[in-house]
A protein has these predicted regions:
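Membrane-embedded transmembrane alpha-helical bundles that form the catalytic cores
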Residues: 1-468
Length: 469
């Protein structure tokens, strides 16, 4: 089940919230949320709900063991068992294919469908076990409460990767107020708008230019396709995170921010402080720092982290290349850290955007031969020409969409919202400002929901990009 479906919006979510808020006690609310989360996950792939239950049970049990007996070998077994499920379900086919290619064998390639969200909930559950071992958090005695942490449907499938330490107190006790619900609804509607009104539409153009045959492709068409995919992946993934955070607010939870205007960055280092924050902080805290961090073997540590980051995104060599591409860029920035601040900010920003654009082209093409050909066209080395009438027409027709996406990636929407809030706050003494702000927000939410509903009713299904990770 996905957030951007009419069934979720008008059947599942309303009934879930109704049952949730009808419960007078927190235990009842937690039970409803667990039940709803299991139904949510099992909707498309019922059998894999048992895998999620097993991963939750594994880490719950190891948490109790590690609290009583903090042995490294116990933690190593826990990590190995968690990673084994990822290897079997996500990487088995990739490993066998490469063994066959390397050793000229003919082993049968496993055809295992990827459980949705396995990378997210496995990392989330594993972080709990490591935190218990480190004494950062007390082990949870109740399997039901731990299952709620792992399976909570707002962030189950595509994050943010929530740390147990951040929600442990909220599982035991949380407050509900109208303002939080109000803000949660707005955040959810913003995310829905990002996904349905922007990501899905630019994604169609990106697939048209990058996903089909390269016959007739031009340099400009490849640049336009990469730009559209750059917009798509941001609005798709940040839109999901907005919806997850919004639903969390409605239910009384506070999830971490996962995106902070990443395309406003002036360096790749800054970009990764703003993009998919829950993943980058996971690798920082559970891989980079334990390896030695900035204290020793810095570049080796970065190499390991970015190789793993690439593999986390998918079992394909292009994802490994994507991770290593960022490894190289981050190393270069470390080496030039004294010189880079001397370059004008606008130049650094434009160079950063160009480098990010290149990265998304690597990310998009899982077939390495197509990736190579795309870059030949991208840099005008294929003899295909700079543009043609088809590309020009596509560009002209999508200029308004490109403009809206560019503004949406900037600080303009946030700044505008803050200004409106401040103007309304000036009238807060007599209560008028608050009412005006509430009315404007309500109209804004309703408009986004209506437009998204119309779009969903007239279009085919578009899954979130990060569901496959």
């Amino acid at each position: 089940m996905v957030f951007s479906s009419l069934f979720f919006l008008y059947i599942f979510l309303p009934y879930c919230l109704l049952l949730y808020f009808l419960q007078p006690r927190l235990g009842g609310k937690n039970a409803v949320l667990i039940g709803a989360s299991l139904i949510f996950y099992a909707w498309g792939e019922p059998v894999y709900v048992f895998l999620m239950l097993a991963v939750a049970g594994l880490n719950w049990g190891f948490g109790l063991l590690l609290e009583r007996k903090r042995e490294k070998w116990l933690l190593a077994v826990c990590v190995a068992l968690n990673l084994s499920s990822l290897i079997v379900f996500k990487y088995a086919g990739f490993l066998v294919e490469n063994i066959n290619a390397l050793f000229k064998t003919a082993l049968a390639v496993p055809q295992i469908s990827l459980p949705i969200g396995i990378s997210f909930y496995t990392f989330q559950a594993l972080s709990y076990s490591v935190d218990v071992y480190r004494k950062d958090v007390a082990a949870q005695r109740s399997y039901a409460k731990f299952l709620l942490y792992v399976s909570m449907f707002p962030q189950l499938i595509a994050g943010p990767i929530v740390r147990y330490v951040d929600v442990a107190a909220q599982i035991e006790s949380r407050e509900f107020d109208a303002e939080s619900v109000f803000r949660g609804v707005t955040r959810f509607c913003v995310g829905l708008g990002k996904k349905v009104l922007l990501a899905d539409h630019v994604g169609q153009v990106a697939d048209q230019l990058l996903g089909g045959s390269f016959v007739g492709a031009t340099t400009l068409s490849m640049w336009l396709g990469a730009l559209m995919f750059m917009f798509q992946i941001y609005f798709d993934f940040s839109g999901y995170s907005d919806m997850a955070i919004g639903l969390g607010k409605i239910l009384g939870f506070r999830f971490m921010e996962n995106f902070k205007l990443p395309y406003t960055s002036k360096s790749i280092t800054e970009f990764w402080r703003r993009w998919h924050i829950s993943l980058s902080s996971f690798f920082r805290d559970y891989v980079y720092i334990p390896l030695g961090g900035n204290r020793k073997h810095v570049y080796l540590n970065l190499f390991i982290v970015w190789s793993l980051t690439g593999l986390w995104h998918g079992a394909s060599w292009n994802f490994v290349l994507w991770g290593l591409y960022f490894f190289v860029l981050l190393c270069v920035e470390r080496l030039l850290k004294k010189q880079l601040p001397k370059i004008p900010k606008i130049v650094r920003h434009l160079v950063t955007l160009f480098l990010i654009l290149i990265s998304w082209n690597i990310f998009y093409h899982e077939d390495l031969s197509r990736l190579l050909e795309s870059f030949r066209i991208f840099f005008g080395l294929s003899g295909a020409g700079f543009t043609n009438e088809t590309t020009n027409l596509l560009l002209r027709n999508n200029l308004p969409l490109i403009f809206v996406c560019a503004v949406g990636c900037s600080a303009v929407p946030q700044f505008t919202g803050n200004v409106i809030g401040l103007l309304c706050a000036e009238k807060a003494d007599d209560g008028v400002g608050h009412k005006v702000y509430a009315a404007l927000t309500f109209v804004f939410d309703l408009a986004l929901l209506a437009l998204a509903t119309i779009s969903l009713a007239g279009s085919s299904y578009h899954a979130f990009l990060y569901f496959r990770f």
